Amino acid sequence: MKKTKTVLILAAVTGVLFLGGCGSEKTKIYEQAGKDLSQGSYKYALEEYQSSIQNGVKLAQSYRGAGIASLRLGKYEDAVNSFTEALNCDKVSKSLCKDILSYRATAELKSGKYEDAMADCQTLGEDFSMDAGSYFLTGKVALAMDSYEEAASNFKQAYGEDSTYDMAIEIYEAYLDKDMEADGTRYLEAALSSEAKDAQDHCDRGRVYYYMEDYSNAKKELLEATKKDNTEALLLLGMVYLAQDDVENAQAMYKQYISAVGDSAKGYNGLALCDIRSGDYDSALDNITKGLPTAATDEMQSLLFNEIVAYEKKLDFATALTKVQEYIEMFPEDSAAKKERAFLKTRTSSEG
C-alpha cells in the first residue's frame, strides 16, 4: 500500500513538472514573439504570436502582437481582424483598448477603409483622453477623406501636444502625400524656431532643412551632428548629397553609415539609389539584395520599389513587371506602383 502511494505521488509530481514545463515553453514562445517584434523580425513574430493564440497565452496581447506584425508586413486586412479579435477578448484594460483601437484605425487607413478608421478615431475621442498621437492619426484619416479643416484642426492639436521635430516632419509628410506641401511647410518652419541643444537637435534640424530643400543649411547642421558621433546624420548627409547630384560624396556617407552601424537596409538602399543615379544597375540590385534581410516593412517597400526601377532601367521590362505585380500584392495602396505597372504592361505587350 505504501509503495503504491509513493508511485502515485511520484506520478503526480512528474505530471506537475511536465505541465509546468509545457506552460514554460508556451510562455517562452510569447516572450520571443515580443523580442522579434521589437527587433523588426515581423514574420517570426507573427508566427510566434499565432502559436501563442493557439496556446491561449495572453490572448488580447497575442492578438495585438499578431496585428502589429501583420501591419508591419503590409497585411492590413489580417491586421484589422487580429485587432478586432483582441478588442473582443475578456478583461481588456482601458489603456490596452486605446492602444489597440489606434492600431486598428492605422490598419484601416492603410487598407483604404477610411470610414472605419474615422469611426475608431471618433471612439478614441469619445471614450479616451486624446494625446498627440491620437490627434495626428485623426488628422491623417481626415486628410485621406479630404476633410481638410478637420485635418488642420487635429494636426494643430497634435503639434500643440508634441512640438518636436519629429511631429513637424510627420505632419509635413502627411500633407506632402496629398500634394499640399505649403500646409505642411509651416510646421517645419515652426520647428526651426528653437535653437539646437545637442547632436540630435542638429541632426533633426538638418532633416527639416532637407525636407525644405535648403541643402546648404542641412549640410551645416548635419556636419555639426557628425562631429558628435551622430550616425543618423551620416545617412541624412547621403540623402542631401544625392539630392544635389553629388553621387560620390553620397556613396561615401552611406558606406560610412554602414561601417558605423553594421548591415543596414537604409544604408544599402542609399547605395542602390546612388547606383541607379550613376547607371550601375547591377550594383544597385546587389545592394538591394544585401539590404532586404534586415529591412523593416517601410524599408523593404523602398528597396523593392527601387528593385523595380533598376530592372526597368536595365530594359528588362518582363522582370520589372513581375516584380511590380509582387510588390502591389504586398503594398496595395501604392498608387505610384500601379502607374508603374500600367506603363510596364505597355512595354511588355509592345515587345510581344
Residue ranges and their predicted role:
Residues 57, 91, 95, 128-130, ...:
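Short coil turns that delineate tetratricopeptide repeat
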Residues 38-39, 72-73, 110, 144-145, ...:
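Register position in tetratricopeptide repeats
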Residues 27-28, 61, 95-99, 133, ...:
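Start-of-helix register in tetratricopeptide repeats
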